[in-house]
Structure formats: C-alpha cells, structure tokens
C-alpha cells in the first residue's frame, strides 16, 4: 500500500531527504528546486507532500497523510493526537526564554510580564508552572525585535547557536526544552498500513542512530532560574 508523507518545508527539508536516501529510499523524481508540492514516488511506494511545518501535525492527525516529519517544538505547541515513535535526531534546537542583556536577572517577575513568542501555549504552560503571571504577545517572526522596541520583557523562541540572540543584545535566560525532528504517524494508518509504517520506522531508526551519535546537539543550558523572585539558581 502507498504511504503518503508530509515533509516540512524550509531548512529541515534537505536534512529529511538526506535521511530518507541514507535509509535506501531512491527519490529520483523529488526536486527541492521545483514549485511542485506533491511528489509521487511509486518506485518506493510513497507520495510526498511539502507543507508548512506548523501544518504537518494537522495533516497527520486528520488522516490527509499517513506520516509526517516535523520538529518537536511544533508538536509541543499544538499537542496534536498523533503517534510519535521516532526521534530522528537532526535539526537540534532548543526552546528558550531570552531577555535583553543586563535585564535578564532584573527582579521583574514579581508582577505581570509581557512575553513575545510564536509559541503561546508552550509559553503559557512554562510560566504558569512557575507561578508567574504573563501577558503573551503572539508574533509570527523576528521575535528578537520585541524587547528592543519595548514590546515585551522576555521572548520565547527557538535557538540553535545563539548567534541571532547575541546580534540583538539578547541573552538566554533559561531553556524550556530541546527540539529535534520527529516522525509522527496517523493512528488509523498505524493499524491499516502497519507493515508499511513499521518498515519505514525501522529503516529510519537505523540511520537516525548513526546521525544521532555524531550530530552537534543544542542542549539545554544550566538553568538561570526564571522564578517569581527573579533570583538565579546557583549552579
């Protein structure tokens, strides 16, 4: 049976294709230079769809596709009802809280603070767990600008190297979670196409172990303690 797979467009796409090729899937008809969004590959029993990363869980949950490849950050934010059997190991980033340099340790968490982010649900859960009242400002890009123009006290964003934060005079206050590419499966497809899905998981897991063992990770840094008191935790 043919598997339909949603791939995240953007910089994760090339890494995803490389993993599939290492797993032995010949994708001759696939071209990232094409404007096409649907790529049938009958020679390997798969059809690929190129979609926005934030749409991948929706396509999978509602059965428009059988399988998807998407970052853990998107899954945490959307909390979709999908089966997540495999961490592919690439695309390592971290979801982090950041603030202007010199203001990171300022005692401003005793009252309501503004936080700009494209991850409102993750942000709300994080600060609620710490008893900090927040006003969340949803942005769709260039999150680093928010503290520079006084729009927000903090930001929650995806960080890979930290260079973008440094370029905007921001420092990482605390890491919320790590994010890597994940394989997710529609729950009905897992039953109806069990053999095909299991074979895909097995092959990708084999090459992902190699990749995971040698990849440059983006680990969570030691916590600086975002707390109501605004004090840092000693390390």
Question: Model-derived features: where do they sit?
Answer:
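Domain-level signature for soluble enzymes in the chorismate/prephenate branch of the shikimate pathway
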Residues: 1-235
